[in-house]
Amino acid sequence: MADKEATVYVIDLGESMADCHNGRNESDLEFGMRYIWDKITTTVAASRKTWNVGVVGLNTDETNNNENREEYQGYENISVLQELGPMTMASLRALKSKIEPSSTSSADAISAIVVALRMIQTFTKKLKYKRKIIVVTNGESPIDDDQSEEVANMLNDVGIELIVLGVDFDDAEYGFKEEDKPRHKEQNEKILKTLVDHCESGAFGTMAQAVEELATPRIKSVRPFKAYDGPLTLGDPQKYPSALSIQVERYFKTKRATPPSASNVANPNGPPQTQVWNEDDGVPFSGVGLQPVKQLRTYRIEDSKAAGGKKDVDMEDLAKAYQYGRTVVPFGKSEEDYLKYETTKSFTIIGFVPMSSYEPFLNMGETGLIVAQKVNEEAELGLSALIHALHELESYAVARYVNKDKAPPQILLLKPNPAIEDDIECLYDIPLPFAEDVRSYQFPPLDKVLTITGNVLTEHRLLPNNDLQQAMSDYVDAMDLTEYGQDDDGHPAEYAPIDDLYNPVIHHMNQAIRNRAVNPDAPLPPVAEILTRFTHPPEPLLAKAKTEIDGLIQAAEVKKVPPKVQGKRGRKDTVKPLSGLDIDALLSETRPRTKKTPIISTENAIPEFKQILETAEDDETIEIAAKQMGNIICKLVSDSFADVLYPRAAENLRVMREELINMEVPTLYNKYITKLKESLLSGNLNGDRREMWFRWIVGGRLGLITQDESEVSEVSENEAKAFLK
């Protein structure tokens, strides 16, 4: 069952809360509300029906609370701004309009706590709830401490946690002390501190620390989710009585975190409607003037007799189909059911591997935790024996796992818990790849060069010499982060520990959503420093390692890359010499320039084609290069046995298309692709080559270059679509 929470925020809206103190450019109320809004918007984002929020205003101009005392004696200027209940965007915006400084500062903070206490008592009764009261004040209004001990006892009896956060309150642990503090404020701080100390569950602190900690991402804690409950077997217990069978339970140990997903909404002209929801779905998405967008998909076929030339087709009349070459092969539901791999729920050990032979890069996903079935001593004994055996033999188990009937099987690696000496006996499981998921690539060796003749070279311009290796070793040692950080006692510790590394995409997205919920017209906040502090090497360490960096640059003979300047055609970038001299002009003075016709080879067509266009100085050179590339594509198609060379021809065509778009000469490509289509469909390229057109050119979107892709093109989008039919 989901956790139930009841939290009441007591917010000081007194006249003094409108003032700015200690060099801040925001009022005490705005400063304190940064914490309140963050907490409330987190509750709204969770969309949990069982998380209830109430708000009590302290030092309000009016008095409106639930105390049935004559003229609210002792509870003046205390108002309930929001009754306890689920928090929605509508109630959030309604609450925001009520948070304004008042013109009074005479209400008693302890009386406001009593109002919040009775709100929680009335709402939660004696049910199981997490009860909490959070007080935000600057301590300027008078406080009567005559009944503080009695109030603390009431809080303890109900089981309420009291948190008091004061604006500019002294906090020795945080290291803050307000200078020239008014005497009455100092006395009020002591009263509130004493009240918190008398509570069995409470906290007292300064608002500066609370606001500072808002930037630290809060890791979501979740309840253990049982993914499997059944036998873990070794062998087939139904066939062999000696087979091993242990009743186990499997839970998720780690789960991939994802950023919140967005949905399409609309601002309708009619009255807003509330989306239907149930108890498990959370609060309704309503009250903000937006409605979710519903998608409607229809299927149509051409029919000259129907209105508009098209007729709607029912879903019952449709069948899935797969493309096989240029042929569409339909598959009915019966064929799909026949092709499904039938599985039954099972968890079976299929083998064992030594720990030393397992490579960590084979880990494929989220980790699971396997423990013995609860209240089953036989299962506990059996699993314990298996875990100890794996430890002693330094082995891992490999298991086939199907969490439910007809689910796809997984291969899991079962690792015994390394902390077995702490009486924590469990197995960790990690998904393994199947054979077709593993790609083996051959790379040239890093310590030698193999020549074409078979010679082995240990000294080569592509291999590091001893000086370079030593310089790199010194640089790595100088940039060592293992002891660059500090622990709480100031001793050397690891820099950027894993517990301090947060995903900036996920947490900044959450922070931005919370900010936009409260301030829809304000700009988005910058990325919190805690999310980016480890994205770059620390500057002091870089300065300290400058000598090693300079030595590495010298040993590696690192040279500055010449800047690129705009070429003569205004389309491509050309390299400008560091000297600034015109090399072509200097060479033309010593020897006459002869124009060479560029030649592109079939074996190295793409790099040579790009190189020619990179240095092209006139349209004639570009036309020659495009013509040669086109001839190579036609030759590949013509020489292809079946479709063997089609992928290579399509890749050449794709590069040709992209480069001619960049060179702003789409006409060359459009003329060529028109002729190529005619040749492919007419059989002029050594047989039936229509598959090259339909699968690789039409399917690869390598048709005419349109005006959207190149401003100088004269082909419209409709013409390009018609060309591909």
UniProtKB/Swiss-Prot annotation:
Keyword ATP-binding among UniProt keywords: yes
The organism's taxonomic lineage, starting at the top: Eukaryota, Fungi, Dikarya, Ascomycota, Pezizomycotina
Similarity field: Belongs to the ku80 family.
Catalytic activity: ATP + H2O = ADP + phosphate + H(+)
UniProt-recorded Gene Ontology molecular function terms: ATP binding; ATP hydrolysis activity; damaged DNA binding; helicase activity; telomeric DNA binding
Top EC class for this record: hydrolase
Subunit structure: Heterodimer of mus-51/ku70 and mus-52/ku80.
Highest taxon above the source species: Eukaryota
Protein purpose: Single-stranded DNA-dependent ATP-dependent helicase. Involved in non-homologous end joining (NHEJ) DNA double strand break repair. DNA-binding is sequence-independent but has a high affinity to nicks in double-stranded DNA and to the ends of duplex DNA. Binds to naturally occurring chromosomal ends, and therefore provides chromosomal end protection. Required also for telomere recombination to repair telomeric ends in the absence of telomerase. ku70, of the ku70/ku80 heterodimer, binds to the stem loop of tlc1, the RNA component of telomerase. Involved in telomere maintenance.
Domain Ku: 232-478
The EC number(s) this enzyme carries: 3.6.4.12
Organism: Neurospora crassa (strain ATCC 24698 / 74-OR23-1A / CBS 708.71 / DSM 1257 / FGSC 987)
Entry protein name: ATP-dependent DNA helicase II subunit 2
Keywords, alphabetical: ATP-binding, Chromosome, DNA damage, DNA recombination, DNA repair, DNA-binding, Helicase, Hydrolase, Nucleotide-binding, Nucleus, Telomere
GO aspect biological process, one term: DNA recombination
GO CC, one annotated term: chromosome, telomeric region
